[in-house]
Regions:
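Active-site neighborhood of phospho(di)ester-bond hydrolases with catalytic His/Asp-centered motifs
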Residues: 6-8, 29-35, 52-56, 78-80, ...
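Active-site environment of divalent metal-dependent phosphoester hydrolases
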Residues: 11-15, 37-41, 58-63, 84-88, ...
């Protein structure tokens, strides 16, 4: 069983990240989906190789923009989402996931938290944790075998 924390769109709000510090340390994997990718720099040494990051549209020309990670038989496709026009529709994102053979998609960019399933693919957007945003949130996931269970947690400052 793997415990995964997914964050996105922190936009410089280090307080939000540190408000879940213990949860980050206790997790097996931490994904930051961009828009202020560098917000995780201070924790990168502490989290080590359990930290996975992709760059967002506010991270200006950096790579990687997407990654594919296998966890207990599940393929997780992680991206910020801007490359796929997710503010209009998730269709292109879902097609990319299918092309990659992904079972799970983590994405951000919209600042709107959601968990849903489309064509057998679990789609998770943790929402945003930006300083001036409303409804700050992150996602907490548990992978057991080839099954993922996810919740949106709004207990973030």
């Amino acid at each position: 069983m793997k415990k995964i924390v997914v964050l996105s769109d922190t936009h410089g709000n280090l307080g939000a990240i540190y408000s879940i510090y213990d949860i980050l340390l206790e997790s097996d994997m931490v994904f930051h989906l961009g828009d202020h990718f560098d917000d995780m720099n201070e924790l990168s040494q502490t989290l080590g190789d359990k930290l996975y990051r992709v760059y967002g549209n506010c991270d200006f020309g950096r790579d990687p923009k997407e990654i594919l990670v296998e966890v207990e038989g599940l393929k997780i496709f992680a991206t910020h989402g801007d490359l796929y026009g997710v503010k209009r529709s998730a269709d292109r994102l879902i097609e990319r996931a299918k092309t990659l053979g992904a079972n799970v998609v983590f994405y951000g960019h919209t600042h709107s938290a959601e968990i849903r399933e489309v064509d057998g693919i679990t789609i998770i957007n943790p929402g945003n944790a930006e300083r001036y945003g409303t409804n700050k949130s992150f996602s907490y996931c548990v992978v057991s075998g080839e099954k993922i269970t996810a919740v949106i947690n709004k207990n973030i400052d």
